[in-house]
């Protein structure tokens, strides 16, 4: 059944890609207005047949679709509102081609999604200001505050950022109005239930003890558990002396609530446009609590956001913008830390100790003094409070009375944040009662401590950003011309470090002839103060062109094609990663030296890692080639992009340097690599009677190659990293297990194999397994990631479905969660560990024999532990109903919509041991079922 569902999901994704809508390069917008006219309606409550060219946001300006040369992805903010997420980045998956997402942690506040754009982590720009701190990006926005997401992919679209242009840009534009004219107020209330997904299942006490005895026998030791004890574990006759604790069920709740309330007000008048938003959300954690405590110990995350965006026409030529945002966050967790508790859940076996003893005290042993339950409810709590604000002030002056189409702009932004931690953590009493039941021989394994009440500063951050620009926009006959010259100054300071300053001058020139030919050139000269003098500044140029073939005379008779455009761009871009003044040699306290006959040590100062005064900005040469196609009255379209990024001056430590120096070598600009790939979007929208429908698909591929990394000359070609993918998994190639028929096969140096141990391929044929037999063991195919969306609307009902997935993704599953009894002979074991080698399971075993001692041979990094973590996920589903306005009291309520949505609803993957994204045993991802209503007043 699972294979059938997986096949059906792949078919749906393929069909969506072939016949989809809403490609992220273009956005379908109604002719009458490109803003949302009804905050209570779904994105399908808009005309789907008639469209006009959309002005897309580009860096420091706008550009019409027909003049576009750059490679840009676009997403209407409305598309994110169906995702019941508490961190904005968790809603991006599957929407934008070229943007790879991975969420490896599901914890409230900290469960943000990592983003990768064509192999690099993109810079976040919000309302024109670069943001480096998640406080001002993922955690400072909710979907209802967003007007659009713009993804700047190629070098030409980002080159004006100079030494910050290499990684691409995810540009967020917040709303400045809610309606096409007049004013409106809307309120949305929603609440949902979270439940953990993809957690490993630990063994029962009986299975654990049986496997433990087997491991001791394989290590030549006597059994640890007698048959009487095994029977007691299986029968559960004495839960105190022979516990069988499901720690996950004991520590974690089946589900946890989350809620969000949003009040928005907006207006659009001749001289003023505004958007005001007040948002509160709360996300509870999964931990159980003890009613005996007078305080909460569960994870709890609350966030308050206030946003005010105002645009004012002071006169016909002068416009002012004022954006204010305030962000307050409270985060509570158990005193021992939520991460520590989940680590214990992965490491504590079911028979380690009783949850509580028969006297009601916490249980514990010498081997397991800290039970997951005691750590969750008995260690007090820690509370973090964060307060952040940002203010943007902008002025735009038109200078048409001097030079037609000219203007000047100024933007000033100031953003401070402050976080403090209140520590009320403590220890607890835990006791071990011996298996004899002798209550007079009780061992205390943990002792209670006083509960402090201390406050410490966790972090300070402030950013000042200043931007001055002037430009010209002119059109005459068949010519369109625009130009901009811009100077920027970005000063940020974190905690007690010295300020980091980015500053530069940039320009862009765009010319269009006869709506057929478009050319664009841009450049930036930028600097960073943390490089050595002489290496702080560099110049970054870029250029591109596009050709609208559908406007050529030989295409005029074609009524089917509405758009056919070729695009190409090339740019030199940079990535400033200066570190903290690493060009300056540092010294620190060293070991004590003894002089003379006295045994008194004298303090010393030692040289730190070698400095590199020649360190410069990492760079890349980016090439992009694109095709844009729209057809059938713009009901369908296809966009294709090919990119190639040749990176050089990449920072790395030399691999060919001698290790006898006695000091760490510095990072140097010697690395070279290449990223390339293809991105395809397709779309279709139409109506069938009263049914409106849309279907979309996007798929992206990215591959990488190491071109140079200064590795030592390898004796065998298969050992080289050069020519293989960047960050490729390397290790030994597993070749099954040793059995009585192959015990003389090549083995690890100094190791005598036993039946059931891992056998490795002797790649160089010398009869010995050593470092000379290590090679690439991961998948070297291009990484594929994709999204597919289906939208339906009829008779007030609407539905949106989003699938998202990844192919050709390998993970390395090594660590304490993979290897049983790997903590000095202790530790948890999981259901998949039962697939170990025994003489009876020799033909089906997927893991080596179990042992108590750390058998190095069996736990080496090898292909045995490389898993295919490709997956397809039903990422989001929403069903809504918009009440007919005719039956509403129009004097009070102008619109009402009810909705139910869900996130992470189903996952289909070959990897069964855990969630394919969150496989390291961290706070689990959650399936969310959410419902609510939106009211427009």
Specify the residue positions occupied by each region the protein language model found:
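Extracytoplasmic gating/loop element in the C-terminal half of outer-membrane beta-barrel translocons
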Residues: 224, 348-358, 374, 753, ...
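Short, solvent-exposed beta-strand-terminating loops
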Residues: 194-198, 419-429
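Calcium-binding motifs, dominated by EF-hand helix-loop-helix domains
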Residues: 759-763
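Membrane-proximal, glycine/serine-rich, low-complexity loop/turn segments characteristic
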Residues: 2-8, 14-17, 22-114, 118-131, ...
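Acidic carboxylate motifs that coordinate Ca2+ or other divalent cations, activating on Asp/Glu
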Residues: 766
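Conserved active-site-proximal loop/helix segments of enzymes involved in bacterial cell-wall
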Residues: 652-656, 769, 817
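Extracellular/periplasmic, surface-exposed regions of secreted and cell-surface proteins
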Residues: 309-318, 323-328, 334-337, 345-348, ...
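C-terminal extracellular loops and terminal segments
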Residues: 665-674, 713-732, 771-772, 776-791, ...
